[in-house]
Amino acid sequence: MFYAFKDFEKKETLLIGLFKKSRLYGKAEEIDRLLNGQLSQLLKDGDVSSKKAKVSKIFTPSLQGVKRIYIVGLGREAEFTFEDAKQCFAEAVQLIHKDRKQELTVMLDSFVSEEVPAADAAHALAESCMLSCYEVQDYKHRSNVPDQCLQSVYVLTDHDLKEIQASLHVGQVYGNATNSARTLVNMPGNMLTAADLASYAAELAAKYEFECEILEKAEMEELGMGGLLAVNQGSEEPPKMIVLKYQGKETWDDVIGLVGKGITFDTGGYSIKTKSGIVGMKSDMGGAASVLGAMEAIGELRPEQNVLAVIPSTDNMISGSAMKPDDVIVSLSGKTIEILNTDAEGRLALADGLTYAKHHGASVLIDVATLTGGVVVALGTETTGAMTNHDPLYQQVRQAAEEAGEAIWQLPITEKDKKRVKNSQMADLNNSPGREGHAIMAGTFLGEFAEQTPWVHLDIAGTATTAQNSCFGPKGGTGVMVRTLVTFVERFSGNL
């Protein structure tokens, strides 16, 4: 889809970036000459905006073979960042996509600044193209008119073509993997059961030559996975413990464990959700989607790391056999848990997932989960909540998130918090100490299963979906944390 080259070839559609108080230069200046100074005159007359992410459209009948030029404002060059580049590309490409253009030539060097070298600009372009052109895969009857979409992007640059092509590939992989996670999150619960999620993971494993293990209910019972099994008690759909193993080193050490919550629909159980709260609970497997999206990118990029993905999956339903408040269950770790709230089910499944990842050699753990409404109250819908038992690991995750352009914010774990999750007359732990500090209580509970293993918890309840369309795509699943996880895996030093 992306092709880097040095010599300008006349294509129907061109995209140029324009900094504030800038003139046309390089390849853009060459095109201006072919247009007899039309672009520079429009710039001089103020008919083309350099305001950040503002897109101007110019028709060019005088330039044979080139029908339309899009110019996107980039703002001040000294303030232009990698995230700005992604936004500007996304705004422009989304408009070009809506105009049903199938080919595009991008003057890459017009987007280069001191903060954004050519390779980064190429990554931003490819990632933004994939994200901004994403469309929800719905189940509506369609007309017989075939959809037209952007098929080929030609990247014109004076920089090293091999380096630019490599960056375009990485950006495309990041975007595609994020979109894969979005599609999973958007799928209805009746079309994405735990078995369906396991089949998807198995297909991913076959494509990228991962080792794949799918534990069935009988095997879980034999191992004593009381957390996941308790959540599954009310369901007619069998649970699955999904395990993918990618070995990028000669020996199985310094293993990164990625654990994703795979609750394919959450009624809340007997602690049933409200009418407004239950709609949208098909997305309660957002953590699993993020982990699977990350594994797709890892399969494409083949980093020299060892990665273990663990996804405990089921739905949380109501029936005569469903778990009840006051029940006591025994987790895979051997720790007992008193159930005070059946809607605090994700942490039960994750408890077994974290333990299973440790049993299979995980040196560090990162769990991703749409875990609590409390994190949405605390941090809103743009920032993912994070908790940890190991600050050096958290700093690596934070740096990866910053590089990927995904906001996270650390919440505390205190000794008083630990006492609250241990406050039970009947068991080692309780699964819901109360509404106060709800997001913190959930993370603290998970920390009891990470134990001494370095661990970071990412609560994406507020960020896994969006209610607004944006330049990065339609409302629905966001694929949040896919890019953070992949960046973390690629950068992980192992020195903690």
UniProtKB/Swiss-Prot annotation:
Identify the stretch annotated as signal peptide in this record.
none
GO terms for MF: manganese ion binding; metalloaminopeptidase activity
Asked if Cytoplasm is a keyword of the record, the answer is yes
Q: From the Swiss-Prot or TrEMBL record, state where the protein is found.
A: Cytoplasm
Q: Which InterPro entries match?
A: Leucine_aapep/pepB, Macro_dom-like, Peptidase_M17_C, Peptidase_M17_leu_NH2_pept, Peptidase_M17_N
Cofactor descriptive note: Binds 2 manganese ions per subunit.
Active-site residues annotated for this sequence: 273, 347
Q: Please write the reaction equations for the catalytic activity of this protein.
A: Release of an N-terminal amino acid, Xaa-|-Yaa-, in which Xaa is preferably Leu, but may be other amino acids including Pro although not Arg or Lys, and Yaa may be Pro. Amino acid amides and methyl esters are also readily hydrolyzed, but rates on arylamides are exceedingly low; Release of an N-terminal amino acid, preferentially leucine, but not glutamic or aspartic acids
Query: What keywords would UniProt list here?
Result: Aminopeptidase, Cytoplasm, Hydrolase, Manganese, Metal-binding, Protease
Q: Which Pfam families match?
A: Peptidase_M17, Peptidase_M17_N
Q: Which residues bind Mn(2+) 1?
A: 266, 343, 345
HAMAP family (alphabetical): Cytosol_peptidase_M17 (MF_00181)
- To which protein family does this belong? Belongs to the peptidase M17 family.
Protein name stated in the entry:
Probable cytosol aminopeptidase
**Organism, as annotated:** Bacillus licheniformis (strain ATCC 14580 / DSM 13 / JCM 2505 / CCUG 7422 / NBRC 12200 / NCIMB 9375 / NCTC 10341 / NRRL NRS-1264 / Gibson 46)
What lineage does the source organism belong to? Answer: Bacteria, Bacillati, Bacillota, Bacilli, Bacillales
Quick one: which gene encodes this? pepA
